[in-house]
Amino acid sequence: INTLGETVVTVQENNHLVVLDYAGKVVADFSAGTVDLDGIDASDDGALIFNEQQAERLREPDALQWIDNDHFAIANEGDMDGGARGWTIFNKRGEVVYESGTSFERAVIEAGHYPDKRSDAKGSEPEGMEFAVFEGTPYVFLLSERGSLVGVYDVSNLAEPQLTQLLPSGLSPEGAVAIPSRGLLATANEGDLGEDGGPRAHVMIYQYQDAPAVYPTLTSAGADELIGWGALSGLVAADDM
């Protein structure tokens, strides 16, 4: 709910968005639209190859957050026939102000968090989202359910959000709550590997700091081509390389 008492609702399976006033009257409703995806892995074949396309992919948004009284952001998870692997900022008249395209998923891939087994479905599957202002800077936090990662975006310029950091998450982050007064972000992670002796579903808490990001410690960003990875068996480096 924004400060005008307006609510925006995602009708996910219908790929639609509805804005209601405080009395429940429909102020606006419009399609969430589609995205053309290029340079993705759309095949579950055990190989990280990012040379496929999906045209007019339905956004089918899940979570959303107001950014101000006229703009809101949606996480384009997909549920039935869609999933656009990113996120979008709309104004409440239904105009797209920003579309991430494949840029968020590329960051997930470069950080070694891409879930190849979900390639033929919805890829990194951004589902949850939070918005908060920390020390005067507005941030959108985008949760990659399948990539187990949180993207932190500075949305000071709504037309050009900046990815400032990736936060390693527990398995399958589903929801998030920001507590700016304490400099905290909490995420609820629904993945539960208890039966296999692994981590149970849990909550993670992050603290806001004015310091360089410490994650990821290794990335394939800057390579001539997009390189995905998920494990390392050996590593060597030298100062003069």
Residue ranges and their predicted role:
Residues 1-241:
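Sequence/structural signature of beta-propeller domains
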